[in-house]
């Protein structure tokens, strides 16, 4: 249960940073801090796409896979609720105006691939065991992804960032679910590709 609690807390603060600031650097720093906070307990995924990649890597037991993902979505939902209480606005990611769905999906695939690849390398590779750079590397990867792709796809790179807030917005009667497919296909495809690439390029 400690692992699930950490995943809930980390996802909550990550999404809260997204909802309240929208600032890529602040979001990256928050992720970095949460990685250092919970890495030794849960692995600090805070992202179902990362959880899937780590599971494919063999570093997460199958009986914890969905528990992690549910905890992350619940944390994101809680963040959306808190943000609404604080600023009176319901948050959910969305693509830029005039951006085609395939463009958004491609951006989500690319930068989720980058994020998951970095996580698998710095947090699961034997050659980098015991390093203290992992949080910094992970946080800055997300920040760069948010700077680069935020105006295209919304820069989620994390299904929970979309699912939790979209569920909350649906309670307000304000949610359009059309964009959800972008934040499912893109991040999960990116995570799967990262795990496959890591398996091919690195030691088991």
Question: Which role fits each region the language model picked out?
Answer:
Residues 1-204:
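Membrane-interface helix-loop junctions and terminal tails of multi-pass membrane proteins
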């Amino acid at each position: 249960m400690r692992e699930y609690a950490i995943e809930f807390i980390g996802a909550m603060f990550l999404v809260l940073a997204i909802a309240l600031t929208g600032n890529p650097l602040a979001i990256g720093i928050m992720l970095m801090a949460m990685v250092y906070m919970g890495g030794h307990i849960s692995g600090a995924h805070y992202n179902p796409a990362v959880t899937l990649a780590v599971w494919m890597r063999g570093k997460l037991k199958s009986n914890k896979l969905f528990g992690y993902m549910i905890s992350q979505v619940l944390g994101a939902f809680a963040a959306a609720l808190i943000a609404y209480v604080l600023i009176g606005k319901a948050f959910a990611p969305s693509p830029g105006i005039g951006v085609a769905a395939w463009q958004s999906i491609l951006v989500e695939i690319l930068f989720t691939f980058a994020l998951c690849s970095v996580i698998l390398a710095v947090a699961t590779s034997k050659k980098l065991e015991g390093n203290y750079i992992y949080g910094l590397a992970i946080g800055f990867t997300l920040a760069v992804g948010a700077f680069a792709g935020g105006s295209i796809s919304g820069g989620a790179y994390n299904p929970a960032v979309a699912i939790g807030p979209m569920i909350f917005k649906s309670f307000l009667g304000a949610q359009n679910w059309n964009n959800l497919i972008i934040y499912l296909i893109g991040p999960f495809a990116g995570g799967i590709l990262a795990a496959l690439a890591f398996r091919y390029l690195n030691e088991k």
